[in-house]
Amino acid sequence: MRFHGDMLLTTPVISSLKKNYPDAKIDVLLYQDTIPILSENPEINALYGIKNKKAKASEKIANFFHLIKVLRANKYDLIVNLTDQWMVAILVRLLNARVKISQDYHHRQSAFWRKSFTHLVPLQGGNVVESNLSVLTPLGVDSLVKQTTMSYPPASWKRMRRELDHAGVGQNYVVIQPTARQIFKCWDNAKFSAVIDALHARGYEVVLTSGPDKDDLACVNEIAQGCQTPPVTALAGKVTFPELGALIDHAQLFIGVDSAPAHIAAAVNTPLISLFGATDHIFWRPWSNNMIQFWAGDYREMPTRDQRDRNEMYLSVIPAADVIAAVDKLLPSSTTGTSL
């Protein structure tokens, strides 16, 4: 659990703890760069950040000892671990919590790891949300919250609505985030353009979003240039995670690949179309009952994880026509009286 989308998949655990222990103060330890996606969650007392692997060794060491000092001072009663990172086991050993629970990872069976926790729980469930919740089994909690959550302040939506007004976008808009961290999770730009044209023909505005990376912005621009009527690109690379949550929450539909925004759409209960390639499309799928998911494995054989080529665009086998058909299932047939 190290990326932005992963953090949203931990929120049912946070909500379940808060529901069963309403007076508890729940702190979350996560990578520093993923803090923004949970920054507005009202059920979290404090967020503590770990330096990521790109940081200098000296920065990581200083950060580690700072965390030890701060976390020890908090005198926790309970630690719940949802990651297989070695540094966490070391940290947990240095904290004096009475109960320390972790998932029992098959590749973490050393005596050092196992003795770092008071309880090791076998992973259960077909989806990561179910697997995360299963770690609470030793607590014997009465009820579990099984919905992911994404929180944002009113100011985030106020800014997004202002930007939409400036771009001439009304209430009937669709958000598409075509980008992902790696090419094997991406879909063809031309197919995104075809889907956008279909949405425009049905009377919907389209807002393209992305990260600020130059490759992401280049992808957005190429998609826009391939459309008969360009979508709104002014927000690409320019929104915070809480703002993205607000934007997607008020959208009629979200379309995206295996990346954090799809999990945001699930968390705010916006209808979504999700495209997966050579990844576990069941375990990592967005946690939503209001979704149509496409998996490239339904169109051609997918490689195992150890044989996966990270430079191959596996999603290319998914036809634009199939995604457009899914649009018609999730959206009202037309907002203008026209159709393809």
Swiss-Prot record:
Catalyzed reactions: an L-alpha-D-Hep-(1->3)-4-O-phospho-L-alpha-D-Hep-(1->5)-[alpha-Kdo-(2->4)]-alpha-Kdo-(2->6)-lipid A + ADP-L-glycero-beta-D-manno-heptose = an L-alpha-D-Hep-(1->7)-L-alpha-D-Hep-(1->3)-4-O-phospho-L-alpha-D-Hep-(1->5)-[alpha-Kdo-(2->4)]-alpha-Kdo-(2->6)-lipid A + ADP + H(+); L-alpha-D-Hep-(1->3)-4-O-phospho-L-alpha-D-Hep-(1->5)-[alpha-Kdo-(2->4)]-alpha-Kdo-(2->6)-lipid A (E. coli) + ADP-L-glycero-beta-D-manno-heptose = L-alpha-D-Hep-(1->7)-L-alpha-D-Hep-(1->3)-4-O-phospho-L-alpha-D-Hep-(1->5)-[alpha-Kdo-(2->4)]-alpha-Kdo-(2->6)-lipid A (E. coli) + ADP + H(+)
CDD domains noted in UniProt: GT9_LPS_heptosyltransferase (cd03789)
InterPro entries: Glyco_trans_9, LipoPS_heptosylTferase-III, LPS_LOS_Heptosyltrfase
UniProt EC number: 2.4.99.25
Pathway where this protein functions: Bacterial outer membrane biogenesis; LPS core biosynthesis
Name of the gene: waaQ
Task performed by this protein: Glycosyltransferase involved in the biosynthesis of the core oligosaccharide region of lipopolysaccharide (LPS). Catalyzes the addition of the third heptose unit (HepIII) to the second heptose unit (HepII) of the phospho-Hep2-Kdo2-lipid A module. The transfer of HepIII seems to be a prerequisite to the phosphorylation of the second heptose unit.
Protein name per Swiss-Prot or TrEMBL: Lipopolysaccharide heptosyltransferase 3
Phenotype upon loss of function: Mutation of the gene results in loss of the branch HepIII residue on HepII and impedes the activity of WaaY.
Keywords: Glycosyltransferase, Lipopolysaccharide biosynthesis, Transferase
A Gene Ontology BP annotation from the UniProt entry: lipopolysaccharide core region biosynthetic process
The organism of origin for this protein: Escherichia coli
GO molecular function: ADP-heptose-lipopolysaccharide heptosyltransferase activity
A cellular component term, taken from the record's GO annotations: cytosol
